[in-house]
């Protein structure tokens, strides 16, 4: 099965040569997602909860555009800039995954823009 590009309506243009998501053989791969506006400016600069909510809502749009739901998520890669935000990020994260949780990892690192606090990349398997 060929790869399909997933670009939800209203998506901003990426900062680099990639798309928000791809679908291949029932698997959705969501690119690393940050809390950006339409012009790639960071939203909610000092608010890890608001950034996490925006990131996960954006990821949900990509997965729904591909025909799935957040319940289809099997793996998340989470990148945060400061461990002090870990609990706040997890609080919002848990709202998006109330049932069985997907596998994940979380590391502290620098992100592409200084005001970005969290970035998440996702894999989801859509049931056929």
UniProtKB/Swiss-Prot annotation:
This protein's UniProt keywords: Hydrolase
Name a GO molecular-function annotation: deaminase activity
Asked if the record carries the keyword Hydrolase, the reply is yes
Tell me the enzyme class. hydrolase
The UniProt entry, under Pfam families, shows:
Ribonuc_L-PSP
Q: Which CDD domains match?
A: YjgF_YER057c_UK114_family
* Keyword Hydrolase annotated: yes
Q: Which reaction does it catalyse?
A: (Z)-3-aminoacrylate + H2O + H(+) = 3-oxopropanoate + NH4(+)
Which InterPro entries does the annotation name?
RidA_CS (IPR019897), RutC (IPR019898), RutC-like_sf (IPR035959), YjgF/YER057c/UK114 (IPR006175)
Q: Please give the biological process terms from Gene Ontology that the record holds.
A: nitrogen utilization; uracil catabolic process
Q: What is its EC number?
A: 3.5.-.-
* One CC-aspect GO term: cytosol
Similarity annotation: Belongs to the RutC family.
Q: What is known of its domains?
A: Contains a hydrophobic cavity in the center of the structure and ligand-binding clefts between two subunits.
Q: State the NCBIfam families in the record.
A: RutC
Described by its record, this protein's role is as follows: Involved in pyrimidine catabolism. Catalyzes the deamination of 3-aminoacrylate to malonic semialdehyde, a reaction that can also occur spontaneously. RutC may facilitate the reaction and modulate the metabolic fitness, rather than catalyzing essential functions.
**Which HAMAP family does the record associate with it?**
RutC
Q: Assembly and interactions?
A: Homotrimer.
**What protein am I looking at?**
3-aminoacrylate deaminase RutC
